[in-house]
């Protein structure tokens, strides 16, 4: 064994061994308990970033630990390979998205191997290959036949720069999240999957997910947004149709003083024919922010349509306004307004001088003061005719019942959740497998024409999708008739909604899933990824699992038992102000810093002499140029050091502050472990440990070893507090470094301790542990070694620390046998110099003894 720890030499050797032995390849084995550990698959952007490294290190630690418990562990990896960035990069680099993507995959695969992650590479998949997306296309056609897919014209957020539809969440401050271009409203035909048909199940089954973070479950509950209310129909004077609204507060219905409709509503369109002001307003709304978060904060605007609706209970005429806060695609495109008891309605009514009628009393029973704001709390009705005096629940039911009896109301359950629009007007995605015949009939692509292959050898102009620009690509024949293929491609959330299941049978040729393999491995035991995926990916992931279950492919109701959302990785951020006032962000690697005595940054400059402004720690990002390249760190310190720092610096679900000083500390620790093993093995063979022949000091050290095993086992397995597990191993290492090594049993005990330390560190730092296990002559490869088991007998304390007080003041701390009697403890306490001093010449009036903990002598 060489004296110095040289990660650059050992890591590549160990990685080669894993590759050659196919150490982490697994097959179904009914005789073993399975464990499926999965991290969210990466987008092949070109290089790994520290966020990836953190996510995948957490997954690898858990997978390796579970393997050491003797389980059949599946830990696969693949590539979420379709998506818009590839198109931008292709245009920029004058290539096509496919070669750019495949080059990135090859590069990033090497980076993952360099970090020592124990993946089953035989299951690797890339979602951009026809072998993968053919089954997604086939599944879509099956969903169409089940009436779970439909096409409709829909108002969308359109980015004129990217020429694509954006989801509401992708609109930030009215602009495209990717390129910051102002978003427009546009009506286009799109394909939808009926996720709303599963709304109740998606909501109710959240209660089964005991090991998912409450924050994620709450976000999904709110996103699905189940509400109980009443749908009410209004007659409108001089208008051919009625207006239907939905309300969750029928108790306030007597205070409804106006209706509001979306700018795209047929009533508003009709009114605009003779109203230029309204026509201009409708035009303005076409280019308005539509993400819900924006709706809450934007200025509320409207125009009177001139139409009057009739209140079904009072018979009063109330105005109908077109308003920018009503969306056609939410509910009926019309809402009833109760300005006395809804703040948005109140602000709108105040702005345009509309009637505000209070119908709910304040909590103290007085009429509410509406001079400044609406009263939004529930309460007792007044000003409401026959319903006066009813509380919220009674009024809800009475008004709902009356409207139902009149034939103008119906109790309804509503959802905020909308059907999933899966059409994208981009090229680099899976083609949607639908065709249109010459007679206008729309139908699924026949099975014998699947997959509909996306051509990869294309020229990108950065504007139009190559399959839209090439009329020949769309031409096909179905049943002998000419037909045109759909030229939209799937939303890339489609591919990431079922990849976890395909990992169980990536080579399967007979269908989407091999049920036998899928049901052996599924559900996933732990799924690891960022909380930013809470409402999109993680909802579609659950939805797809239920679709596959209902197609008979899987037996379970949910795709993953546990979800672990890792925290972000933060780093220092610096900038200097350029000549034109712009901020130029400087990498923390290039910042020369001065620190105060507490280690805080007080001054910074770069190599060119610019005075830098330090903005603190923020999420590693390209925009702030504060990302740290994992590859540079691995080359400098080794993969094991980077992995150890990642797991030690912070709890897995909290933010992690990148500090190179912390990385250096992790590296020093591994050097100490190496040195201790080197010094131990240099002394030659070791005798067998004789537990019965140990001295008190040796027993105490062995007790520490086994207590550490127990703590680390609990921290990794049950608590998943990996940082405290590492801290416990470090504490034990400090004790081992000071332990005597001269006697035969000293060395035998050290051998037992080091074999335990190396196994406990193995999930975190597998390369050094693989090597040290061999040097310690551990049995076989450490990858097949069992996790150490704490010896209960070794952990039994045979002595305990008792605090000795005289008149309540601590005078000594003494070690006594655990079974010592009170008399023996008093006798031992009397031998202490300070205790004897305070007892000299006085009478002990009272003795308070808490066995094994405290002796208090009261003297007078």
UniProtKB/Swiss-Prot annotation:
Motif position, 'KMSKS' region: 619-623
Positions of short motif 'HIGH' region: 42-52
Gene Ontology cellular component terms for the protein in this record: cytosol
Catalysed conversion reaction: tRNA(Leu) + L-leucine + ATP = L-leucyl-tRNA(Leu) + AMP + diphosphate
UniProt xrefs under PROSITE patterns: AA_TRNA_LIGASE_I (PS00178)
Swiss-Prot/TrEMBL keywords: Aminoacyl-tRNA synthetase, ATP-binding, Cytoplasm, Ligase, Nucleotide-binding, Protein biosynthesis
InterPro entries: aa-tRNA-synth_I_CS, aa-tRNA-synth_Ia, Leu-tRNA-ligase, Leu_tRNA-synth_edit, M/V/L/I-tRNA-synth_anticd-bd, Methionyl/Leucyl_tRNA_Synth, Rossmann-like_a/b/a_fold, tRNAsynth_Ia_anticodon-bd
Cytoplasm in keyword set: yes
Class of the enzyme per the UniProt entry, highest EC level: ligase
Pfam families xref list: Anticodon_1, tRNA-synt_1, tRNA-synt_1_2, tRNA-synt_1g
Compartments, as annotated in UniProt: Cytoplasm
UniProt-recorded Gene Ontology molecular function terms: aminoacyl-tRNA deacylase activity; ATP binding; leucine-tRNA ligase activity
Keyword check for Lipid metabolism: no
Family per record: Belongs to the class-I aminoacyl-tRNA synthetase family.
Entry protein name: Leucine--tRNA ligase
Source organism phylogeny: Bacteria, Pseudomonadati, Pseudomonadota, Gammaproteobacteria, Enterobacterales
């Amino acid at each position: 064994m060489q004296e110095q720890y040289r990660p650059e030499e050992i890591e590549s050797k160990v990685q080669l061994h894993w590759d050659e032995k196919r150490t982490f390849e697994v097959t179904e084995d009914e005789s073993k308990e399975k464990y499926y550990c999965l991290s969210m698959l990466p987008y092949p952007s070109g290089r790994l970033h520290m966020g990836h490294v953190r996510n995948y290190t957490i997954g690898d630690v858990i997978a390796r630990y579970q393997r050491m418990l003797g389980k059949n562990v599946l830990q696969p990896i693949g590539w979420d390979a379709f998506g818009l960035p590839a198109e931008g990069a292709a245009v920029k680099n004058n290539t096509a998205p496919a070669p750019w993507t495949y080059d990135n995959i090859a590069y990033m695969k090497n980076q993952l191997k360099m970090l020592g992650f124990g993946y089953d590479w035989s299951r690797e998949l890339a979602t951009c290959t026809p072998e993968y997306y053919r089954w997604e296309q086939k599944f879509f056609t099956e969903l169409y036949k089940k009436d779970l897919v439909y096409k409709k014209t829909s108002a969308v957020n359109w980015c004129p720069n990217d020429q694509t539809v954006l989801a509401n969440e992708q609109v930030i401050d009215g602009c495209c999240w990717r390129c910051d271009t102002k978003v427009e409203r546009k009506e286009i035909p799109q394909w939808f999957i009926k996720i709303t048909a599963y709304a109740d199940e998606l909501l109710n089954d959240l209660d089964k997910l005991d090991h998912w973070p409450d924050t994620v479950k709450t976000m999904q509950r709110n996103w699905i947004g189940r509400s109980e209310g009443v749908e009410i129909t209004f007659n409108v004077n001089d208008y051919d149709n009625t207006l239907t609204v939905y309300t969750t507060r029928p108790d306030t219905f007597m205070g409804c003083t106006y209706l509001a409709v979306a700018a795209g509503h047929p009533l508003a369109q009709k009114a605009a024919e003779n109203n230029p002001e309204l026509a201009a307003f409708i035009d303005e709304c076409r280019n308005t922010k539509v993400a819900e978060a924006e709706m809450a904060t934007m200025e509320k605007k409207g125009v009177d349509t001139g139409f009057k609706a009739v209140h079904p209970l009072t018979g009063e005429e109330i105005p109908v306004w077109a308003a920018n806060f009503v969306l056609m695609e939410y509910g009926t495109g019309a809402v009833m307004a109760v300005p006395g008891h809804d703040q948005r309605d109140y602000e709108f009514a105040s702005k345009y001088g509309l009637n505000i009628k209070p119908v709910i009393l304040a909590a103290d029973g007085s009429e509410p003061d509406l001079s400044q704001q609406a009263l939004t709390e529930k309460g007792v009705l007044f000003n409401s005719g026959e319903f006066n005096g009813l509380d919220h629940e009674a009024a809800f039911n009475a008004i709902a019942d009356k409207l139902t009896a009149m034939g103008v109301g119906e109790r309804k359950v509503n959802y905020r959740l909308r059907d999933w629009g899966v059409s994208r007007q981009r090229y680099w995605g899976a083609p949607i497998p639908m065709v249109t015949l010459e007679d206008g009939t729309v139908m699924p692509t026949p099975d014998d024409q699947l997959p509909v292959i996306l051509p990869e050898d294309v020229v990108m102009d950065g504007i139009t999708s190559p399959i839209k620009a090439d009329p020949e690509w769309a031409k096909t024949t179905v049943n002998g008739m000419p037909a045109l293929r759909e030229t939209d491609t799937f939303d890339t959330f489609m591919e990431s909604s079922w990849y976890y299941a395909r990992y169980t049978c990536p080579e399967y040729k007979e269908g989407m899933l091999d049920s036998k393999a899928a049901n052996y491995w599924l559900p996933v035991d732990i799924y690891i990824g960022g909380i930013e995926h809470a409402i999109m990916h993680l909802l579609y992931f659950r939805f797809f699992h239920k679709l596959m279950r209902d197609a008979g492919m899987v037996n379970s109701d949910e795709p993953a038992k546990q979800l672990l959302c890792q925290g972000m990785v933060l780093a220092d951020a610096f900038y200097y102000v350029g000549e034109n006032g712009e901020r130029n962000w400087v990498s923390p690697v290039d910042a020369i810093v001065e620190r105060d005595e507490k280690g805080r940054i007080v001054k910074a400059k770069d190599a060119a002499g610019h005075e830098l402004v330090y903005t603190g720690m923020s999420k590693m990002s390209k925009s702030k140029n504060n990302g740290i390249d994992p590859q540079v760190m691995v080359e400098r310190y080794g993969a094991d050091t980077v992995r150890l720092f990642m797991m030690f610096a912070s709890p897995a679900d909290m933010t992690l502050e990148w500090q190179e000083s912390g990385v250096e500390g992790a590296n020093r620790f591994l050097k100490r472990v190496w040195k201790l093993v080197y010094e131990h093995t240099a002394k030659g063979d070791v005798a067998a440990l004789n537990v019965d022949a140990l001295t008190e000091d040796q027993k105490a050290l062995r007790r520490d070893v086994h207590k550490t095993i127990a703590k680390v086992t609990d921290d990794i397995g049950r608590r998943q507090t990996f940082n405290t597990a590492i801290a416990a191993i470090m504490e034990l290492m400090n004790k081992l470094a000071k332990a005597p090594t001269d006697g035969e049993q000293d060395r035998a005990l050290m051998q037992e301790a080091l074999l335990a330390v190396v196994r406990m560190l193995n999930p975190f730092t597998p390369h050094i542990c693989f090597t040290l296990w061999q040097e310690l002559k551990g049995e076989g490869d450490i990858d097949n070694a069992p996790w150490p088991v704490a010896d209960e007998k070794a952990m039994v304390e045979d002595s305990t620390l008792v605090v000795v007080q005289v008149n309540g003041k601590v005078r000594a701390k003494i070690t006594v046998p655990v079974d010592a009697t009170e008399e023996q403890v008093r006798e031992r306490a009397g031998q202490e110099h300070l205790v004897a001093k305070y007892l000299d010449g006085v009478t002990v009036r009272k003795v308070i003894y808490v066995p094994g903990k405290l002796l208090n002598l009261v003297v007078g």
